[in-house]
Amino acid sequence: MYSPKRVKLNVTSGMRKRPETGENNDDLYPPTALARNGISPYFIGKPRRKIVVETPSDSAQQQPPFKSRSQQNGLDDELDGIIIDEDEDRTVDVSFSQKQDTRKLKSRPFLGEKSSFKLGEIPKPKEEKRREEPFTMRGFDFGSDDKVTKIRDKICDIVDPTNARRTDPNFIRQMHENTLKGIEVASNPHFKKTRAPTKNRAAIQNTLGTLYPSFTTAAGQDPQNSKFQVPLDRQSSSQSIGSLAGIPPARRAPDIPKRCSNPLIRKAMGMDTEGGGKDEKMSGLRAEPTLKHFDENIISLIESEIMSVNNEIGWADVAGLEGAKKALREIVVLPFKRPDVFTGIRAPPKGVLLFGPPGTGKTMIGRCVASQCKATFFNISASSLTSKWVGEGEKLVRALFSVARLKLPSVIFIDEIDSLLSSRSESEHESSRRIKTEFLVQLDGVNTAPDERLLVLGATNRPQELDEAARRRFQKRLYIALPEPESRTQIVQNLLVGTRHDITNHNLERIRELTDGYSGADMRQLCTEAAMGPIRDIGDDIETIDKDDIRAVTVMDFAEAARVVRPTVDDSQLDAYAAWDKKFGCLPPPSISR
């Protein structure tokens, strides 16, 4: 059985040294013998480098560093059958001729051959200095490029605006050469732009004296003779320092803190709390101490809900509803105009609920109240007091009442209040319950003053869904019923103002009979449909007909419109409203003819 022999690694050549015993390679393990000879395909040792044998002409010029030619030839024959073993501490001196061709000394790694380099001859590549080749232009003619041609044409327009030299061949050749020269200079990577020479003091002073001959300093002196002039050159440092000796040192301005616009950052830095942000003057509602705990975006959101009533709406614009209008005058208008009279037991209620079928004018009554009481009117919906962030809804409700108390007298009108103050149940979300609780506390809680002129006016068409606590806080619950026959006649007369018609009192009686059970919104839609009757009779002549030639609106148009526009309120809903008003209402139900 073959067994591998322990061999010693040759440090110089990287080969394994032959065993000292005279055994034959045939007696060794085959892979060991192949690896020892350096011809095994599995040999993973350090690869040897083969030195290309020199030509006779080159070898004749090179002299051996240690031995003569005869001794060297004998040494070459001796090295054909042995492997040189060198010690690690031995150093080899190598010298080459400067005229030797470096291409013949290239070495390449190989496997399976014996080393044939001479003793002391270790190839070393010759270092060559890299010469910097001069920049040369490409063979492409950039002068014929489209962009270059456009630029050259613009330059020609500046140089020769009259086009007198455009046909001159010398001018064309000169412009073409200048273009190529400019491209060559701009494309040269070694090109460095020369800096303009700096002007000395005398040149600058002469220039200033030429441009501004009558210029003097604030003291009336000549700027050239002034002792406060700044040195313009650095040639004499002693003169520069001497000229600045009389100038007092400039004091550094104190650092002015920048105003932070992000409310979250301002709150984190303590700039919105008491004692913070003293360098900044707060203005508007943000300066109020009661609003210091709210963010600026919350206050801005509440301010955006303040409605300015540009068109004044009177009680006469609200047809019918005499009982509701009388109650609202006593609750809202008169206490706001005479707060000295309505005090103590005469203090008005803080909550008024308007309920009834849709389209009866509840929102219009709210606009009329805002116009008549001359108070700050907040038009609030459920979306104004809700947020996707937990806890923000309660802050919005609290901020709403805080801003309203700062702008007394105030009226907070909440349309469709049932979506905000519906009955609390176990299945509702916790955030909705907290918003309702905060609203009820702000409406009538411990911190509310009894004589403050703040009114919450709510409107809903589903009063049976309101929470019990909310129903108690609305002391006045007014039923806004369907318009009575006289109210429907008044609505038709108000809507036909400005429209040509032939409606008489007898026709109004006919319209009153046709519109039984109609709400205020249904009456408006009926009048709009009747007013379109004359327009439909014109047909295709609408583009050419004169406005005065359009016929008037008649009772027949109302009869045709009544066939299209039907009442939107069901009798069962009217019965439910009447039952709730009988149980919780504050006004006697009006008599409605059906």
Swiss-Prot record:
Gene3D superfamilies: 1.10.8.60, P-loop containing nucleotide triphosphate hydrolases (3.40.50.300). Residues 1-79, 239-261 are annotated as: Disordered. Changing residue 373 to A: Slightly inhibits ATPase activity. SMART domains: AAA (SM00382). Residues 56-73 have a biased composition (Polar residues). InterPro entries: AAA+_ATPase, AAA_lid_3, ATPase_AAA_core, ATPase_AAA_CS, MT-severing_AAA_ATPase, P-loop_NTPase, Spast_Vps4_C. Its cofactor is Mg(2+). GO terms for biological process: ATP metabolic process; cell division; positive regulation of mitotic cell cycle. The keyword ATP-binding applies. Pfam families: AAA, AAA_lid_3, Vps4_C. Expressed in germ cells. Optimum temperature is 25-30 degrees Celsius. Its main location: nucleus. One of its GO terms (cellular component) is nucleus. It is found in: Nucleus. Disruption phenotype: Sterility owing to depletion of germ cells. SUPFAM superfamilies: P-loop containing nucleoside triphosphate hydrolases. The keyword Repeat does not apply. Optimum pH is 8.0-8.8. It comes from the Eukaryota. Has a role in spindle assembly which acts in the progression through mitosis during embryogenesis. Required for fertility. This is Fidgetin-like protein 1. It comes from Caenorhabditis elegans.
